[in-house]
Structures are given as structure tokens and as C-alpha cells.
């Protein structure tokens, strides 16, 4: 699968990740945030890595743009999100990784997608690492 965007989201959902979970040698999840202006759900496919029990790491890179991705800005308004990994859908709380944990998480993510290091060189902003922590009922 070479897509990444709305069609990626639609195929991922329709097949419970059979199409879309594996993407260019990586694994992706679907992150649904609440739009900070619209209040509407916004879903984005993102490369991820497990970060411990019930935790997953994603990178707010936007390809090295000087502006952060909209989904990251949405988290500032409402850190409670929905995550889908294959057929597993769950609520999670998102937080930006702290300075003590970020280097190891960044290294793990850059091993998954080496372009992250290049993205950081392209921008003056510090690209955040985001931790998604599954919420238990």
C-alpha cells in the first residue's frame, strides 16, 4: 500500500488494518483527535512503536515542517483520543514525552522511520514525541 491520507484511513477501517497497518516497512495506527475549531473527529494514520505496556509512541513531525501537524495542536485542546491498531480500538490519553524519556523514544522511532532525523534537521522547531496511553474503563 502506497497511500497515506484519507484513503489510507478508509481502507484501514474497512479491513480492520489488514490493509494499511503495514506501510512501507513500518506499522501504522489510526489516531482520532477532536478538532480544536470544529469539534469534529479528525483521523490521521501515523507510524508508531510500542512504548511499554498499553503505551504507544508517535512523532509530530509533519515531514519536518516549521508548523506542527493539526492533530498535535488538537491534543492541546483535548488530549483524550481514540486509537485503532489493526482491529483493536481504544480510548487513550496523549501527552508529549518529557526530556528524560524523549531521547530513547526518538531513537526507537528513527529506527522505524529514519527520515525523522532528516525532518528534525529541516526545521527549527523541536519535533515532539507523543505518548498514547490506553485508558482503562
Describe the role of every protein-language-model region.
Residues 26-61:
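Short beta-strand segments
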Residues 61-116, 122-126, 134:
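Short, structured beta-strand-loop surface elements
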Residues 1-27:
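Extreme N-terminal tail/first-helix region
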Residues 51-53, 88, 137:
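Short strand-connecting beta-turns/loops that link adjacent beta-strands
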Residues 1-5, 33-40, 80-89:
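N-terminal short leaders/motifs
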Residues 28, 127-129:
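Short hydrophobic/aromatic beta-strand or adjacent loop that forms the aromatic wall/cage
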Residues 7, 132-134:
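Long, non-globular segments of proteins
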Amino acid at each position: 500500500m502506497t497511500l497515506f491520507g484519507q484513503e489510507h484511513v478508509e481502507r484501514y477501517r474497512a479491513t480492520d488494518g489488514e490493509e494499511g497497518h503495514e506501510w512501507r516497512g513500518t506499522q501504522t495506527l489510526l489516531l482520532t483527535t477532536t478538532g480544536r475549531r470544529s469539534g469534529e473527529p479528525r483521523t490521521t494514520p501515523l507510524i508508531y512503536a510500542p512504548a511499554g505496556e498499553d503505551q504507544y509512541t508517535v512523532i509530530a513531525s509533519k515531514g519536518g515542517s516549521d508548523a506542527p501537524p493539526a492533530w498535535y495542536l488538537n491534543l492541546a485542546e483535548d488530549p483524550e483520543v481514540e486509537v485503532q491498531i489493526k482491529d483493536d480500538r481504544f480510548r487513550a490519553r496523549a501527552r508529549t514525552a518529557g526530556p528524560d524519556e524523549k531521547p530513547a523514544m526518538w531513537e526507537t522511532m528513527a529506527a522505524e522511520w529514519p527520515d525523522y532525523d532528516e525532518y528534525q534537521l529541516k526545521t527549527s522547531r523541536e519535533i515532539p514525541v507523543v505518548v498514547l496511553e490506553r485508558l482503562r474503563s
